[in-house]
Amino acid sequence: MAEKNSHIRNFSIIAHIDHGKSTLADRLLEHTGTVTKREAQAQFLDNMELERERGITIKAQTVRMKYRAKDGRDYELNLIDTPGHVDFAYEVSRSMAACEGAILVVDATQGVEAQTLANVYQALDHDLEIVPVINKIDLPSADVEGVRQEIEEVIGLDAKDAVPASAKEGIGIGEILEQIVHRVPAPEGDPDAPLKAIVFDSWYDSYRGVVMLVRVFEGTVRPKQKIRLWSNRKEFEVQELGVFAPFAKAVGELQAGEVGVVVANVKDVHDAKVGDTITDAARPTEEPFPGFKVVKPMVFSGVFPIEAADYEQLRDALEKLSLNDSAFTYEPETSQALGFGFRCGYLGLLHMEIVQERLEREYQLALITTAPSVVYRVTDTSGAVEEIDNPAKLPPVQKIAKLEEPHLTCHIHARTEDVGAILKLCQERRGLQRDLKYLGTKRVQITYDIPLAEVVFDFFDKLKSVSRGYASLDYELKGYEEADLVKLDILINGEPVDALSVIVHRERAYQRGRDLCQRLREVIPKQMYEVAIQAAIGAKVIARETVKAFRKNVLAKCYGGDISRKRKLLEKQKEGKKRMKQVGSVEIPQEAFLAVLKVEE
């Protein structure tokens, strides 16, 4: 191992949402004097307004700290801040590949949660040295010994050295830094070997093009050097190199073991994919990093501007978003009901909410979003297989030989008293129980196979509400399985509204159709004629609701007298309504599209 690297430590922080990861990062920055008290705003590394507000980390961030340890040596610590949410699992795994160690933060009041576990296993897969930290010991309900035991039982890590800390109060921070220095191994790698570096994040800067966050494993990268990206063989010239300490500053070179920023005239963020390998164009390395994959979106929804005039603006906004987010995809689509818009693909539900919120917030757009759907695999009668992300594109029933839908393996961590409610929820969502094991006396881990389409709606919210917020969920894609699915169309006055159609399981179709019609009846305003709302599978109508018409009291000026006079007036009114119905079109409000989303309650 090169002597040069012995002072470098690359580490990340693993934690479940809200266990205090970003606060701990802030304290480390302050303790090492990287950030002055004046600059230290809360959650320093979460740059996006949205990240701060939701208290989650979306993009990976890095920062370099200088630290003088108790042994009198100066160390360079590179903290790689990873997203903790399950939607961004691939980004987490790439960030881990760039480290040698990880701080495992566990909340002293909550114990080990599902996402903590998922990330720990990933860290162990990458052979990282794990430093456990028990955070939030300043809270009255903290149970340090219980959590220590739990770390040993559930994860199987030795927790006798676990540092009790409180990031908020700044307790135990020095001890954590000492442990990083002594326990996390220094990076290996030869600065003179052919260049080999991994990209673990990239974003778009309007002045410099694509900025890549890299960890150099072998060799050295310098300005003016020609580099090659492994996955697409494209070559670029390095413009500038830098590190975040914590604000960007330029450096002359990045050597094996270092983490930094490379700017190299790359124009398209899709060229610099997360997990790709960078090497020297003149003397390339033998082989790339294993495990590179192009992330595929799992959840799709239509996004339409409420004002047709905003279409161009929406397109620009999506383009800018996709510059920073290579996992997000979009393509134009038209809907008879909603006009022109886009079909967007996301990694998962959180990702979808974030993208939609950023569109509305950063680009001030008023949008309608259709119900999220997943990618179905359709085999038609001729044997051709097609992937369909939009219910409107489903071929007619006669032509479908089989329909398959994606399934997830879900790991749910919960308190023992909530098991019944959670099992019931999973059963309702067509889940198949795979495993149930008790972790100690208070916690339980439940494993289920659940179709993605059932999770997409509001599974997460429901899980949180049946467990009073204590359950946590982690999932991975298991594969496709055949299912008895049908397309449910919604007709309004006999006209199908494409944006309201959904693909559902046949057993659920009646219930779902009825619920949908009832919901729509509440949100579609009364017209001058009656409006029929129907749910149909193919040509068979399975549910109907009617929105009654407004009517003027035409009999107000008849006093007593003959019934035939009244009948004449009523018949005349009826004729008029009938004529109106032939030419009238029903305005469908935004709430109607949201009604499709919230059917389950």
Curated annotation (Swiss-Prot):
It catalyses: GTP + H2O = GDP + phosphate + H(+). Residues 6-188 form the tr-type G domain. GO terms for molecular function: GTP binding; GTPase activity; ribosome binding; translation elongation factor activity. Its EC number is 3.6.5.n1. It is found in: Cell inner membrane. Its main location: membrane. GTP binds at D18, H19, G20, K21, S22, T23, N135, K136, I137, D138. It is a peripheral membrane protein. GO terms for cellular component: plasma membrane. PANTHER family: TRANSLATION FACTOR GUF1 HOMOLOG, CHLOROPLASTIC, TRANSLATION FACTOR GUF1-RELATED. HAMAP family: LepA. Belongs to the TRAFAC class translation factor GTPase superfamily. Classic translation factor GTPase family. LepA subfamily. This is Elongation factor 4. It comes from Anaeromyxobacter sp. (strain K).
